[in-house]
Amino acid sequence: MDIEKIYKESGALLKGHFLLSSGKHSPNYLQSAKVLEDPKKAELLAKELAKQIQAAGIEVDTVCSPAIGGLLAGYELARALGVRFIFTERKDGKMTLRRGFEVEPGEKVLICEDIITTGGSAMEAAKEMEKRGAEVVAFAALANRGVCQRTGSEIPSKSECKLPSNKTLFALADFTFPIYEPKECPMCAEGSEPIKPGSRGN
């Protein structure tokens, strides 16, 4: 499956000058919502991701996603795996489990995002699950930015990766784009202003 082709055809592989949530700049941005707005594509990608997880013999009771980016990917993955889906969300800046969701002690939870960059939000969701007695068995995403190493990839984890090295990351593809500190950004040097994705219809 050519994941990059699917992202391009969906208009989800954006080019420009973007301000990332990390505060760094990049000439590229992945907008998974553009892929996931098509239920057939969402189902196809989730089934492909589920195959990886099942082939690895990972036992999953529940898929949990951090809101809001991971919701559609996580729901479709849970459907493909035949398990339930829950999500965490921020309240007063802290990732929490709300809306009556509960997890049982020892429940095997897989954390799913649409895209993993450093894995910060995914790790926050994982800690919330562990705090409630669940066992986080793995992490998954449709796309991986190449900061954290996914299973089957030769690209090693970088120091910025926040995911634990003893838990497997499943993803369909690596998307490695240039990322710059603002003071080292060549686009800024040319006088370009960065756009925060979502702020101007992106």
Curated annotation (Swiss-Prot):
Protein name: Orotate phosphoribosyltransferase
Higher taxonomy: Bacteria, Pseudomonadati, Campylobacterota, Epsilonproteobacteria, Nautiliales
Assembly and oligomerization: Homodimer.
Coiled-coil blocks: none
Pfam families given in the database record: Pribosyltran
Swiss-Prot/TrEMBL keywords: Glycosyltransferase, Magnesium, Pyrimidine biosynthesis, Transferase
Single annotated GO MF: orotate phosphoribosyltransferase activity
Cofactor(s) listed: Mg(2+)
Domain of life: Bacteria
Binding site for orotate: T117, R145
GO biological process: 'de novo' UMP biosynthetic process; pyrimidine nucleobase biosynthetic process
Reactions accelerated catalytically: orotidine 5'-phosphate + diphosphate = orotate + 5-phospho-alpha-D-ribose 1-diphosphate
Enzyme class: transferase
Listed InterPro entries: OPRT, Orotate_PRibTrfase_bac, PRibTrfase_dom, PRTase-like
Pathway: Pyrimidine metabolism; UMP biosynthesis via de novo pathway; UMP from orotate: step 1/2
E.C. numbers: 2.4.2.10
Role according to the record: Catalyzes the transfer of a ribosyl phosphate group from 5-phosphoribose 1-diphosphate to orotate, leading to the formation of orotidine monophosphate (OMP).
Residue positions binding 5-phospho-alpha-D-ribose 1-diphosphate: E113, D114, I115, I116, T117, T118, G119, G120, S121
Family assignment from sequence similarity: Belongs to the purine/pyrimidine phosphoribosyltransferase family. PyrE subfamily.
Gene3D superfamilies, sorted: 3.40.50.2020
